[in-house]
Protein backbone atom coordinates (compact mmCIF):
# COMPACT_ATOMS: atom_id res chain seq x y z
CA UNK A 1 0.00 0.00 0.00
CA UNK A 2 2.56 2.55 -1.12
CA UNK A 3 1.13 5.99 -1.85
CA UNK A 4 3.21 8.47 -3.82
CA UNK A 5 3.37 12.19 -3.17
CA UNK A 6 5.78 14.91 -4.26
CA UNK A 7 9.34 13.81 -3.41
CA UNK A 8 7.97 11.40 -0.80
CA UNK A 9 6.14 8.08 -0.61
CA UNK A 10 4.20 6.45 2.22
CA UNK A 11 3.82 2.72 2.90
CA UNK A 12 1.00 1.86 5.31
CA UNK A 13 1.08 -1.92 4.78
CA UNK A 14 1.81 -2.60 8.45
CA UNK A 15 -1.12 -0.61 9.79
CA UNK A 16 -4.16 -2.48 11.15
CA UNK A 17 -6.51 -1.19 8.45
CA UNK A 18 -6.32 -0.83 4.70
CA UNK A 19 -6.67 2.69 3.34
CA UNK A 20 -10.26 1.99 2.30
CA UNK A 21 -11.09 0.65 5.77
CA UNK A 22 -9.41 3.65 7.34
CA UNK A 23 -11.51 6.10 5.35
CA UNK A 24 -14.65 4.20 6.35
CA UNK A 25 -13.78 4.51 10.04
CA UNK A 26 -11.40 7.29 11.08
CA UNK A 27 -12.16 9.14 7.85
CA UNK A 28 -15.60 9.93 9.23
CA UNK A 29 -13.90 11.95 11.96
CA UNK A 30 -12.89 14.61 9.44
CA UNK A 31 -15.06 17.69 10.08
CA UNK A 32 -17.65 18.71 7.54
CA UNK A 33 -15.71 21.82 6.58
CA UNK A 34 -12.27 20.19 6.37
CA UNK A 35 -11.81 21.30 2.75
CA UNK A 36 -12.49 24.90 3.79
CA UNK A 37 -10.06 24.62 6.70
CA UNK A 38 -7.16 23.43 4.61
CA UNK A 39 -7.87 26.06 1.97
CA UNK A 40 -7.85 28.71 4.69
CA UNK A 41 -4.57 27.36 6.08
CA UNK A 42 -2.83 27.52 2.72
CA UNK A 43 -4.15 31.03 2.03
CA UNK A 44 -3.02 32.32 5.42
CA UNK A 45 -6.64 32.83 6.53
CA UNK A 46 -6.96 30.18 9.23
CA UNK A 47 -7.25 31.76 12.69
CA UNK A 48 -5.30 31.11 15.85
CA UNK A 49 -8.32 31.93 17.99
CA UNK A 50 -6.74 32.15 21.43
CA UNK A 51 -4.02 34.56 20.28
CA UNK A 52 -6.29 36.34 17.78
CA UNK A 53 -3.94 36.16 14.82
CA UNK A 54 -3.88 34.42 11.44
CA UNK A 55 -1.80 31.31 10.79
CA UNK A 56 0.55 32.24 7.96
CA UNK A 57 3.51 29.86 7.96
CA UNK A 58 2.36 28.13 4.76
CA UNK A 59 2.69 31.44 2.90
CA UNK A 60 6.41 31.33 3.74
CA UNK A 61 6.89 28.46 1.29
CA UNK A 62 7.03 30.86 -1.63
CA UNK A 63 10.62 31.15 -2.79
CA UNK A 64 10.34 34.93 -2.49
CA UNK A 65 8.31 35.04 0.72
CA UNK A 66 11.24 34.87 3.11
CA UNK A 67 12.87 37.82 1.43
CA UNK A 68 9.64 39.79 1.37
CA UNK A 69 9.08 39.16 5.08
CA UNK A 70 12.63 40.31 5.68
CA UNK A 71 11.81 43.65 4.02
CA UNK A 72 13.91 43.28 0.86
CA UNK A 73 14.97 40.18 -1.03
CA UNK A 74 18.37 41.57 -1.89
CA UNK A 75 19.27 42.14 1.77
CA UNK A 76 18.58 38.54 2.77
CA UNK A 77 20.46 37.18 -0.22
CA UNK A 78 23.31 39.66 0.12
CA UNK A 79 23.75 38.82 3.79
CA UNK A 80 24.04 35.13 3.01
CA UNK A 81 26.39 35.63 0.08
CA UNK A 82 28.69 38.06 1.89
CA UNK A 83 29.00 35.88 4.96
CA UNK A 84 29.59 32.72 2.96
CA UNK A 85 32.19 34.34 0.71
CA UNK A 86 34.17 36.02 3.48
CA UNK A 87 33.23 39.52 2.33
CA UNK A 88 31.34 40.34 5.53
CA UNK A 89 33.82 41.99 7.91
CA UNK A 90 33.73 42.45 11.65
CA UNK A 91 34.38 45.74 13.41
CA UNK A 92 38.17 45.30 13.30
CA UNK A 93 38.25 44.55 9.57
CA UNK A 94 38.65 40.80 9.86
CA UNK A 95 36.30 38.51 7.87
CA UNK A 96 33.51 36.79 9.79
CA UNK A 97 34.42 33.10 10.11
CA UNK A 98 31.79 31.87 12.58
CA UNK A 99 28.07 32.42 13.05
CA UNK A 100 26.33 31.47 16.30
CA UNK A 101 22.53 31.13 16.19
CA UNK A 102 21.10 31.82 19.65
CA UNK A 103 17.50 30.69 19.99
CA UNK A 104 15.35 28.02 21.58
CA UNK A 105 12.40 25.87 20.53
CA UNK A 106 11.32 26.73 17.01
CA UNK A 107 14.16 29.24 16.76
CA UNK A 108 16.64 26.40 17.23
CA UNK A 109 15.21 22.95 16.48
CA UNK A 110 14.04 23.62 12.92
CA UNK A 111 17.02 25.68 11.75
CA UNK A 112 19.51 23.29 13.34
CA UNK A 113 17.78 20.24 11.86
CA UNK A 114 17.66 21.82 8.39
CA UNK A 115 21.28 22.95 8.49
CA UNK A 116 22.46 19.51 9.60
CA UNK A 117 20.34 17.60 7.07
CA UNK A 118 21.21 19.75 4.05
CA UNK A 119 24.77 20.94 4.68
CA UNK A 120 26.21 18.68 1.98
CA UNK A 121 24.21 20.55 -0.67
CA UNK A 122 26.38 23.64 -0.38
CA UNK A 123 27.82 23.77 -3.91
CA UNK A 124 30.49 26.36 -3.30
CA UNK A 125 33.12 24.58 -1.25
CA UNK A 126 35.79 26.90 -2.68
CA UNK A 127 34.21 29.89 -0.93
CA UNK A 128 35.01 31.12 2.54
CA UNK A 129 34.75 28.39 5.17
CA UNK A 130 31.94 29.70 7.39
CA UNK A 131 31.13 27.67 10.49
CA UNK A 132 27.56 27.81 11.84
CA UNK A 133 26.95 26.94 15.50
CA UNK A 134 23.73 26.64 17.53
CA UNK A 135 23.18 27.62 21.15
CA UNK A 136 19.87 27.07 22.95
CA UNK A 137 20.32 25.74 26.49
CA UNK A 138 19.41 28.19 29.25
CA UNK A 139 22.06 26.72 31.58
CA UNK A 140 24.88 28.05 29.38
CA UNK A 141 26.22 24.57 28.70
CA UNK A 142 26.50 25.10 24.97
CA UNK A 143 28.30 28.40 25.45
CA UNK A 144 30.92 26.52 27.43
CA UNK A 145 31.62 24.53 24.25
CA UNK A 146 31.27 27.29 21.63
CA UNK A 147 32.91 30.38 23.13
CA UNK A 148 36.40 28.86 23.55
CA UNK A 149 36.58 28.00 19.84
CA UNK A 150 35.39 31.31 18.35
CA UNK A 151 36.99 34.75 18.19
CA UNK A 152 34.99 37.86 19.21
CA UNK A 153 36.48 39.77 16.27
CA UNK A 154 35.39 37.19 13.67
CA UNK A 155 32.10 35.91 15.09
CA UNK A 156 28.57 37.06 14.27
CA UNK A 157 25.64 36.19 16.54
CA UNK A 158 22.10 35.67 15.25
CA UNK A 159 19.59 36.42 18.01
CA UNK A 160 16.55 34.38 16.95
CA UNK A 161 13.40 35.03 18.95
CA UNK A 162 9.88 35.59 17.67
CA UNK A 163 8.97 37.82 20.62
CA UNK A 164 12.52 39.12 21.07
CA UNK A 165 12.06 38.54 24.77
CA UNK A 166 12.55 34.81 25.29
CA UNK A 167 14.21 34.35 28.70
CA UNK A 168 16.28 31.32 27.66
CA UNK A 169 17.65 33.11 24.62
CA UNK A 170 18.55 36.34 26.36
CA UNK A 171 20.24 34.51 29.24
CA UNK A 172 22.68 33.28 26.59
CA UNK A 173 22.87 36.68 24.89
CA UNK A 174 23.66 38.43 28.18
CA UNK A 175 26.54 36.03 28.81
CA UNK A 176 27.84 36.62 25.29
CA UNK A 177 27.80 40.38 25.88
CA UNK A 178 29.93 39.90 28.98
CA UNK A 179 32.31 37.69 26.99
CA UNK A 180 32.58 40.32 24.25
CA UNK A 181 33.31 43.29 26.54
CA UNK A 182 37.10 42.91 26.85
CA UNK A 183 37.49 42.82 23.05
CA UNK A 184 34.78 45.03 21.53
CA UNK A 185 32.61 47.92 22.59
CA UNK A 186 28.88 47.31 22.74
CA UNK A 187 28.46 49.64 19.75
CA UNK A 188 30.97 47.64 17.70
CA UNK A 189 29.28 44.38 18.66
CA UNK A 190 25.74 45.50 17.83
CA UNK A 191 26.67 47.20 14.56
CA UNK A 192 28.93 44.52 13.10
CA UNK A 193 28.52 41.27 15.03
CA UNK A 194 24.77 40.86 15.64
CA UNK A 195 21.78 40.06 13.45
CA UNK A 196 18.29 39.95 14.92
CA UNK A 197 15.54 37.69 13.55
CA UNK A 198 12.13 38.31 15.06
CA UNK A 199 8.50 39.23 14.51
CA UNK A 200 9.13 42.16 16.86
CA UNK A 201 11.00 44.85 14.92
CA UNK A 202 10.53 47.42 17.69
CA UNK A 203 12.04 45.03 20.21
CA UNK A 204 15.14 44.65 18.06
CA UNK A 205 15.42 48.41 17.66
CA UNK A 206 15.04 48.98 21.40
CA UNK A 207 17.80 46.46 22.02
CA UNK A 208 20.11 48.49 19.81
CA UNK A 209 20.26 46.40 16.65
CA UNK A 210 20.44 48.67 13.57
CA UNK A 211 17.56 48.28 11.08
CA UNK A 212 19.97 46.98 8.43
CA UNK A 213 20.78 44.08 10.78
CA UNK A 214 17.14 43.16 11.41
CA UNK A 215 15.23 40.39 9.64
CA UNK A 216 11.53 40.16 10.37
CA UNK A 217 8.76 37.65 9.75
CA UNK A 218 5.02 37.78 10.26
CA UNK A 219 3.38 37.47 13.66
CA UNK A 220 1.22 34.68 12.23
CA UNK A 221 4.25 32.39 11.81
CA UNK A 222 4.43 30.18 14.89
CA UNK A 223 7.87 29.31 16.22
CA UNK A 224 7.57 25.58 15.54
CA UNK A 225 6.51 26.34 11.96
CA UNK A 226 9.16 28.98 11.28
CA UNK A 227 12.13 27.33 9.56
CA UNK A 228 10.65 28.47 6.21
CA UNK A 229 10.76 32.12 7.28
CA UNK A 230 13.63 34.48 8.02
CA UNK A 231 14.37 32.23 11.00
CA UNK A 232 15.80 29.84 8.41
CA UNK A 233 18.71 32.24 7.89
CA UNK A 234 21.14 29.84 9.54
CA UNK A 235 20.04 27.11 7.11
CA UNK A 236 20.75 29.39 4.15
CA UNK A 237 24.12 30.33 5.66
CA UNK A 238 24.99 26.64 5.87
CA UNK A 239 23.77 25.57 2.43
CA UNK A 240 23.69 28.71 0.32
CA UNK A 241 20.60 30.37 -1.13
CA UNK A 242 19.67 27.89 -3.84
CA UNK A 243 19.41 24.77 -1.62
CA UNK A 244 17.33 26.81 0.82
CA UNK A 245 14.99 27.83 -2.00
CA UNK A 246 14.76 24.20 -3.12
CA UNK A 247 13.66 23.25 0.38
CA UNK A 248 10.85 25.80 0.11
CA UNK A 249 9.88 24.41 -3.29
CA UNK A 250 9.57 20.89 -1.88
CA UNK A 251 7.38 22.13 0.95
CA UNK A 252 5.22 24.09 -1.50
CA UNK A 253 4.73 20.96 -3.60
CA UNK A 254 3.48 19.12 -0.49
CA UNK A 255 1.11 22.01 0.25
CA UNK A 256 -0.43 21.59 -3.19
CA UNK A 257 -0.65 17.82 -2.70
CA UNK A 258 -2.40 18.34 0.65
CA UNK A 259 -4.92 20.64 -1.01
CA UNK A 260 -5.58 18.69 -4.18
CA UNK A 261 -4.90 14.97 -3.73
CA UNK A 262 -7.91 12.73 -3.03
CA UNK A 263 -8.10 11.51 0.55
CA UNK A 264 -7.06 7.97 -0.32
CA UNK A 265 -3.85 9.30 -1.92
CA UNK A 266 -3.23 12.25 0.38
CA UNK A 267 -0.09 11.60 2.43
CA UNK A 268 -0.65 14.13 5.26
CA UNK A 269 -4.31 13.10 5.63
CA UNK A 270 -3.44 9.40 5.74
CA UNK A 271 -0.73 10.03 8.35
CA UNK A 272 -3.28 11.96 10.39
CA UNK A 273 -6.09 9.42 10.12
CA UNK A 274 -3.90 6.43 10.98
CA UNK A 275 -2.66 8.41 13.96
CA UNK A 276 -6.22 9.18 15.08
CA UNK A 277 -7.28 5.54 14.68
CA UNK A 278 -4.27 4.22 16.59
CA UNK A 279 -4.84 6.74 19.38
CA UNK A 280 -8.60 6.45 19.72
CA UNK A 281 -9.44 2.89 18.70
CA UNK A 282 -6.27 1.00 19.63
CA UNK A 283 -5.52 3.12 22.68
CA UNK A 284 -1.84 3.57 21.81
CA UNK A 285 -0.52 6.74 23.41
CA UNK A 286 2.91 7.10 21.79
CA UNK A 287 4.58 7.34 18.39
CA UNK A 288 8.25 6.54 17.80
CA UNK A 289 10.02 8.48 15.04
CA UNK A 290 12.79 6.28 13.61
CA UNK A 291 14.83 7.82 10.77
CA UNK A 292 17.34 5.50 9.09
CA UNK A 293 19.52 8.21 7.59
CA UNK A 294 22.02 9.99 9.79
CA UNK A 295 21.26 13.34 8.20
CA UNK A 296 17.77 13.11 9.72
CA UNK A 297 18.92 12.25 13.23
CA UNK A 298 17.42 15.50 14.56
CA UNK A 299 13.98 14.75 13.11
CA UNK A 300 12.56 13.08 16.27
CA UNK A 301 13.30 16.12 18.44
CA UNK A 302 11.83 18.48 15.86
CA UNK A 303 8.64 16.44 15.45
CA UNK A 304 8.36 16.12 19.21
CA UNK A 305 7.92 19.87 19.46
CA UNK A 306 5.79 20.17 16.33
CA UNK A 307 3.28 17.55 17.44
CA UNK A 308 3.25 17.70 21.23
CA UNK A 309 3.26 21.50 21.52
CA UNK A 310 0.48 21.69 18.93
CA UNK A 311 -1.89 18.91 19.99
CA UNK A 312 -0.97 17.99 23.57
CA UNK A 313 -4.13 19.61 24.96
CA UNK A 314 -7.24 18.86 27.02
CA UNK A 315 -9.32 21.77 25.78
CA UNK A 316 -10.92 22.72 22.48
CA UNK A 317 -10.23 25.77 20.36
CA UNK A 318 -13.29 27.28 22.09
CA UNK A 319 -11.63 26.65 25.49
CA UNK A 320 -13.98 23.84 26.49
CA UNK A 321 -12.69 20.82 28.42
CA UNK A 322 -12.57 17.53 26.52
CA UNK A 323 -12.59 13.96 27.79
CA UNK A 324 -11.04 12.08 24.88
CA UNK A 325 -7.39 11.41 24.00
CA UNK A 326 -5.59 13.85 21.74
CA UNK A 327 -1.99 14.07 20.57
CA UNK A 328 0.32 11.16 21.46
CA UNK A 329 3.71 11.26 23.13
CA UNK A 330 6.32 11.66 20.39
CA UNK A 331 9.72 10.13 20.96
CA UNK A 332 12.34 8.18 19.01
CA UNK A 333 15.87 8.38 17.74
CA UNK A 334 18.24 7.57 14.91
CA UNK A 335 17.18 4.04 13.93
CA UNK A 336 20.56 2.30 13.56
CA UNK A 337 21.68 3.58 16.96
CA UNK A 338 18.30 2.76 18.47
CA UNK A 339 18.82 -0.86 17.47
CA UNK A 340 21.63 -0.95 20.04
CA UNK A 341 19.65 0.91 22.70
CA UNK A 342 15.84 0.79 22.95
CA UNK A 343 14.83 -1.62 20.17
CA UNK A 344 15.11 -4.56 22.59
CA UNK A 345 12.15 -3.12 24.48
CA UNK A 346 10.25 -2.47 21.26
CA UNK A 347 10.66 -6.04 20.12
CA UNK A 348 10.05 -7.89 23.39
CA UNK A 349 8.69 -5.43 25.94
CA UNK A 350 5.08 -5.26 27.10
CA UNK A 351 4.25 -1.74 25.97
CA UNK A 352 2.28 -0.87 22.87
CA UNK A 353 3.60 1.73 20.46
CA UNK A 354 3.28 2.92 16.89
CA UNK A 355 6.22 3.96 14.74
CA UNK A 356 7.09 6.06 11.74
CA UNK A 357 10.17 4.68 10.00
CA UNK A 358 11.89 7.06 7.58
CA UNK A 359 14.27 5.72 4.95
CA UNK A 360 16.35 7.09 2.09
CA UNK A 361 16.94 4.58 -0.70
CA UNK A 362 19.95 6.11 -2.46
CA UNK A 363 22.66 8.61 -1.68
CA UNK A 364 25.02 10.34 -4.05
CA UNK A 365 28.61 10.81 -2.87
CA UNK A 366 30.22 13.43 -5.10
CA UNK A 367 33.82 14.25 -4.41
CA UNK A 368 34.81 10.76 -3.33
CA UNK A 369 36.74 8.09 -5.19
CA UNK A 370 34.87 5.26 -6.93
CA UNK A 371 35.91 2.84 -4.21
CA UNK A 372 34.67 5.13 -1.45
CA UNK A 373 31.39 5.78 -3.27
CA UNK A 374 30.91 2.04 -3.59
CA UNK A 375 31.47 1.60 0.13
CA UNK A 376 29.05 4.37 1.01
CA UNK A 377 26.39 2.92 -1.32
CA UNK A 378 26.81 -0.45 0.39
CA UNK A 379 26.30 1.20 3.77
CA UNK A 380 23.12 2.87 2.52
CA UNK A 381 21.78 -0.53 1.45
CA UNK A 382 22.71 -1.89 4.88
CA UNK A 383 20.69 0.87 6.56
CA UNK A 384 17.66 0.24 4.32
CA UNK A 385 17.85 -3.52 4.96
CA UNK A 386 17.88 -2.96 8.71
CA UNK A 387 14.99 -0.51 8.49
CA UNK A 388 12.83 -2.97 6.57
CA UNK A 389 13.81 -5.92 8.78
CA UNK A 390 13.08 -4.26 12.12
CA UNK A 391 9.84 -2.78 10.86
CA UNK A 392 8.71 -6.21 9.69
CA UNK A 393 9.67 -7.86 12.98
CA UNK A 394 7.80 -5.22 14.99
CA UNK A 395 4.72 -5.90 12.88
CA UNK A 396 4.73 -9.63 12.20
CA UNK A 397 6.69 -10.88 15.19
CA UNK A 398 8.38 -14.27 15.36
CA UNK A 399 7.53 -17.34 17.43
CA UNK A 400 9.65 -20.10 18.91
CA UNK A 401 7.61 -22.38 21.17
CA UNK A 402 10.75 -23.92 22.63
CA UNK A 403 12.39 -20.67 23.74
CA UNK A 404 10.51 -17.75 25.33
CA UNK A 405 13.56 -15.53 24.80
CA UNK A 406 13.19 -16.10 21.06
CA UNK A 407 9.53 -14.99 21.01
CA UNK A 408 8.70 -11.63 19.42
CA UNK A 409 5.00 -10.74 19.80
CA UNK A 410 4.84 -8.14 17.02
CA UNK A 411 1.54 -6.44 16.35
CA UNK A 412 2.89 -2.91 16.39
CA UNK A 413 1.45 -0.71 13.59
CA UNK A 414 3.84 1.50 11.64
CA UNK A 415 4.27 3.74 8.64
CA UNK A 416 7.26 3.85 6.33
CA UNK A 417 8.10 7.21 4.77
CA UNK A 418 10.31 6.73 1.72
CA UNK A 419 12.57 9.18 -0.06
CA UNK A 420 14.39 7.99 -3.16
CA UNK A 421 17.09 10.49 -2.22
CA UNK A 422 17.42 13.06 0.53
CA UNK A 423 17.41 16.37 -1.33
CA UNK A 424 16.35 19.85 -0.25
CA UNK A 425 13.04 19.21 -2.03
CA UNK A 426 12.34 15.87 -0.34
CA UNK A 427 13.36 17.27 3.04
CA UNK A 428 10.98 20.21 2.62
CA UNK A 429 8.18 17.89 1.52
CA UNK A 430 8.73 15.61 4.53
CA UNK A 431 8.51 18.42 7.07
CA UNK A 432 5.49 20.01 5.37
CA UNK A 433 3.73 16.62 5.33
CA UNK A 434 4.12 16.35 9.09
CA UNK A 435 2.92 19.92 9.58
CA UNK A 436 -0.26 19.15 7.65
CA UNK A 437 -0.69 15.87 9.53
CA UNK A 438 -0.62 17.75 12.84
CA UNK A 439 -3.05 20.37 11.52
CA UNK A 440 -5.48 17.69 10.30
CA UNK A 441 -5.44 15.89 13.63
CA UNK A 442 -5.97 19.21 15.40
CA UNK A 443 -9.15 19.99 13.47
CA UNK A 444 -10.41 16.41 14.01
CA UNK A 445 -9.96 16.78 17.76
CA UNK A 446 -11.30 20.34 17.79
CA UNK A 447 -8.01 21.83 19.01
CA UNK A 448 -6.19 25.06 18.35
CA UNK A 449 -2.87 23.62 17.18
CA UNK A 450 -1.19 27.03 17.16
CA UNK A 451 -1.01 28.08 20.81
CA UNK A 452 0.94 26.71 23.79
CA UNK A 453 -0.41 28.03 27.11
CA UNK A 454 1.26 25.23 29.06
CA UNK A 455 4.65 26.54 28.03
CA UNK A 456 3.76 30.08 29.07
CA UNK A 457 2.42 28.93 32.46
CA UNK A 458 5.65 27.08 33.20
CA UNK A 459 7.68 30.19 32.36
CA UNK A 460 5.65 32.28 34.81
CA UNK A 461 6.18 29.84 37.67
CA UNK A 462 9.90 29.69 36.87
CA UNK A 463 10.16 33.47 37.21
CA UNK A 464 8.49 33.25 40.64
CA UNK A 465 11.09 30.69 41.74
CA UNK A 466 13.94 32.76 40.27
CA UNK A 467 12.91 35.80 42.29
CA UNK A 468 13.24 33.72 45.46
CA UNK A 469 16.64 32.40 44.36
CA UNK A 470 17.78 35.98 43.68
CA UNK A 471 16.60 37.12 47.11
CA UNK A 472 13.91 39.37 45.68
CA UNK A 473 11.03 37.41 47.22
CA UNK A 474 10.40 35.20 50.25
CA UNK A 475 7.52 33.29 48.66
CA UNK A 476 7.11 29.67 49.76
CA UNK A 477 6.08 26.94 47.33
CA UNK A 478 6.00 23.31 48.44
CA UNK A 479 8.22 21.21 50.68
CA UNK A 480 10.31 19.79 47.82
CA UNK A 481 10.80 23.08 45.95
CA UNK A 482 11.60 24.98 49.14
CA UNK A 483 14.16 22.36 50.17
CA UNK A 484 16.04 22.62 46.87
CA UNK A 485 16.02 26.42 47.05
CA UNK A 486 17.43 26.28 50.57
CA UNK A 487 20.11 23.80 49.48
CA UNK A 488 21.14 26.08 46.60
CA UNK A 489 21.54 29.00 48.96
UniProtKB/Swiss-Prot annotation:
List locations, semicolon-separated.
Cytoplasm
Q: Where is the active site?
A: 309 (proton donor), 340, 459
- Residues passing through the membrane, by range: none
Entry's Gene Ontology cellular component terms:
cytosol
The UniProt entry's GO biological process terms, in alphabetical order, are: gluconeogenesis; glucose 6-phosphate metabolic process; glycolytic process
For this UniProt entry, the molecular function terms from Gene Ontology, in alphabetical order, are: carbohydrate derivative binding; glucose-6-phosphate isomerase activity; monosaccharide binding
> Does Heme appear among the keywords?
no
* Reactions catalysed: alpha-D-glucose 6-phosphate = beta-D-fructose 6-phosphate
Output this protein's name: Glucose-6-phosphate isomerase
Which species does this protein come from? Idiomarina loihiensis (strain ATCC BAA-735 / DSM 15497 / L2-TR)
Amino acid sequence: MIKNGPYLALDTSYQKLSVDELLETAGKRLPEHFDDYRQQLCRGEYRNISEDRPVTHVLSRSVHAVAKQSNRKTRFVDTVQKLRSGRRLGSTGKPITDVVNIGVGGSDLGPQMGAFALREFANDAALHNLQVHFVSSMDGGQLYAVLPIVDPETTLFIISSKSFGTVDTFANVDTVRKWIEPELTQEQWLENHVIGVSANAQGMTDYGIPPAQQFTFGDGVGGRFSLWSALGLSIALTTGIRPFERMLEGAKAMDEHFLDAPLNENLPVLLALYGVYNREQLGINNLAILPYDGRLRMLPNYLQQLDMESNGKQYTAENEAIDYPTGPIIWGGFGPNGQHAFFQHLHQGYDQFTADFVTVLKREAPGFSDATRSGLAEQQRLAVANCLAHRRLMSDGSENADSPSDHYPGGHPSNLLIMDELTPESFGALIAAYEHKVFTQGVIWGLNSFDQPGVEKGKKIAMDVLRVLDGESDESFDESTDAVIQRMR
